A protein has these predicted regions:
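Helix-coil boundary/capping segments in enzymes
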Residues: 1-118
């Protein structure tokens, strides 16, 4: 394996640990995850499909909270509105997650640069 394929490296790293499913009847709200389409964040995209693969391991993950990660910002427009692109992106993905049969994105913790003022 070379460092030319960071997505494969990540998959191999994840596969090193398999968690036992303890008490699968207990509903879990995962309070922290990210999604992104580009490779700039980590060297590979992390999509709803990847998210469902990770959360579909047998644990009873009934919902999740997306935390901002500077993904899918608007490329143009006023700088104070560029983070809204991430919220729009995740809102669309959350709608898809609601009908997918997998873990559902229940909340979004978004970003706004308050140092820009009102």
């Amino acid at each position: 394996m070379t460092q030319d394929d960071p997505g494969k490296m990540h998959s191999d790293w994840i596969a090193k640990v398999v968690e036992d499913v303890l008490e699968p009847e207990i509903p879990i709200l995962d309070p922290h995850h990210h999604l992104w389409l580009d490779e700039g964040h980590t060297g590979w995209p992390y999509t709803l499909e990847d998210f469902h693969q990770d959360t579909g391991s047998g644990h009873n993950i009934v919902g999740t909270v997306f935390l901002e990660c500077h993904a899918e910002y608007r490329k143009d427009g006023p700088i104070h509105m560029q983070p809204v692109g991430e919220t729009e992106f995740i809102a669309r993905i959350a709608e898809q997650s609601a009908v997918s049969g997998g873990a559902e994105i229940k909340a979004i913790q978004a970003n706004a640069d308050v140092s820009l003022g009102a």
